Structure formats: structure tokens, C-alpha cells
Amino acid sequence: MEDPSKVQLNQLTDYIMKNCLWQFHSRKWDRERQNEGILTKTKQILLGEEVDLSTPADRCYYADALCLADAYKTEYPWINDMSKDELIQLMQQLKDRIDYVTITGSLNAELTDPRY
């Protein structure tokens, strides 16, 4: 039987990979900032924490995070029953996975091309 936490991580990752266009920024630094911004704000929304909206970038990431958090709560109702610590751990694992898939493990040479 597969580990339930891996199943949950795979479901959240799969949702992003199939439904979120923000993962396709063309530069490494764009992807790093967006992954950090969107996934941090998604975690804050899911935890009911206050979200920083002080900059235009914060507000942009918030818009994507709000959609992602709403989708997660609807598509994966188990997320609503997680403890704060479980959710924090899962969201960190998700960020690590998305960073790997979209940045460090990506074969897209444009991500590191200094002329692009």
C-alpha cells in the first residue's frame, strides 16, 4: 500500500502541473520567485494566516494562490482535516517538488541562458 502522504503530495503536484500556467515562466529566477510567492501564500491561506499584499508582486502571487488554495480545498477535501504541522510539512514538500520539477530538474536550457 502506498504511503498516504506521498499520495497527497502527488495529487497536489499533479494539480499544479496540469492546471497552473505560472509554472512555465521562461527564466530560472522568475520560477524561483513565483514558486516561493505562490506556494507560501497558498500555505498561508490554507492555514488562515494573514497574507502580505504590500507589493504588486505580492498581489499577483496572491491571486494565483487564492485560486490554488480554493481548488485544493474543493478537489482534495482531506486537506481541510490536516493539522497545522501536517499542512506546513506537506506544503514544504510540495514546494521542494515543484522547484525540482520546474527548475533544478528541468532540461529547459533557456532557464539558465544569460541572453534570454
Swiss-Prot record:
UniProt-listed GO biological process terms: nitrogen fixation
Cofactor(s) the protein requires to work: iron-sulfur cluster
This enzyme's EC code(s): 1.18.6.1
GO MF entry, a single one: iron ion binding
Key word Translocase present: no
Primary enzyme class: oxidoreductase
Entry-linked InterPro entries: Nase_Fe-Fe_dsu, V/Nase_d_su
Reaction it catalyzes: N2 + 8 reduced [2Fe-2S]-[ferredoxin] + 16 ATP + 16 H2O = H2 + 8 oxidized [2Fe-2S]-[ferredoxin] + 2 NH4(+) + 16 ADP + 16 phosphate + 6 H(+)
Keywords associated with the record: ATP-binding, Iron, Iron-sulfur, Metal-binding, Nitrogen fixation, Nucleotide-binding, Oxidoreductase
Subunit structure: Hexamer of two alpha, two beta, and two delta chains.
Protein name: Nitrogenase iron-iron protein delta chain
Organism: Clostridium pasteurianum
Gene name as annotated: anfG
